[in-house]
């Protein structure tokens, strides 16, 4: 069930689902597995927020176990395409494609809450069919692995061979370890108080 928020304005009341209300504050929430439906929604939100104000930052909160590489790359490419800076924040878990999208935020604006976990690994896939079909699928997975590792290398400052070795198996990090690794820039302990 999606929570609803009641907002009073000018003597009238409006009801929003919580995600629509957050979007009005330029906040996108990825709180599920990355699928085509998730990707379409997030891409649309990014494009909408850019059209609304191309000079105002966007905030993306991520609590995701990962998901489809193709759909995640669609989100990633859109994040790089839109003009606004994108703050990414891990809340809970950013694993696999979730971690990749966390690292895709604007450098200097990638963060995590302190008890979150972050995990990178190589793409997963299965193959069936005739030997030639299995070979085609294996080549595609190797291509995707190379693309993801190249992007992670560029975003973290780690050399490609280190990324390749670290993503060979599940590689878990605490937020402070993710800062050291270059996946994020900051561990958020407390929300700053505005005076």
Swiss-Prot record:
NCBIfam families annotated for this entry?
clpP (TIGR00493), PRK00277.1 (NF001368), PRK12551.1 (NF009203), PRK12553.1 (NF009205)
Task: Give the location in the cell.
Answer: Cytoplasm
Q: How does it assemble?
A: Fourteen ClpP subunits assemble into 2 heptameric rings which stack back to back to give a disk-like structure with a central cavity, resembling the structure of eukaryotic proteasomes.
The signal peptide annotation in the UniProt record is: none
- Please give the catalytic activity noted in the UniProt record: Hydrolysis of proteins to small peptides in the presence of ATP and magnesium. alpha-casein is the usual test substrate. In the absence of ATP, only oligopeptides shorter than five residues are hydrolyzed (such as succinyl-Leu-Tyr-|-NHMec, and Leu-Tyr-Leu-|-Tyr-Trp, in which cleavage of the -Tyr-|-Leu- and -Tyr-|-Trp bonds also occurs)
> Which domain of life does the protein's organism represent?
Bacteria
The task this protein performs is described as: Cleaves peptides in various proteins in a process that requires ATP hydrolysis. Has a chymotrypsin-like activity. Plays a major role in the degradation of misfolded proteins.
What's an example GO BP annotation here?
protein quality control for misfolded or incompletely synthesized proteins
This chain belongs to the protein called ATP-dependent Clp protease proteolytic subunit 1
Q: What class of enzyme is it?
A: hydrolase
Q: What is its EC number?
A: 3.4.21.92
Gene that encodes it: clpP1
PROSITE patterns cross-referenced by the UniProt entry: CLP_PROTEASE_SER
